[in-house]
Amino acid sequence: HAGGLRYHGAGVIVSQLLKDNLMEAVDIQQLESFEAGCLFAQAEGIIPAPESCHAIAAAVREAEKCKETGEEKVILFNLSGHGLIDMASYDQYLAGNLMNYELKDEDIQKNLDEIKNM
């Protein structure tokens, strides 16, 4: 999902990379995402777009795994843009007004069933 990028689906290239096991998809909740975005901003001086924060959080997770195991690897992620038009979201995060939200499996299935009937 990349809501701010106005695309709510999986791209063809990403889907093929997943199918070929050349990459993996991970679930990042928004609080972890914004935490990683703030860490990146402090370290690099760039406020990342919220969409990029998910990738940053995944990179941080991977770096922490390497730190624990002693493994050395190159970790690459895509910074899709700056977050200067998303400062209100950062304000909400820093004020403690954001929360993680996850749809229940039943709700997802209900919506998928409704799409099938269109």
Residue ranges and their predicted role:
Residues I28, A49-E51, N78-S80:
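Generic beta-strand/beta-sheet core signal
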Residues I47-A59:
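Substrate-binding/catalytic subdomain of NAD(P)-dependent oxidoreductase enzymes
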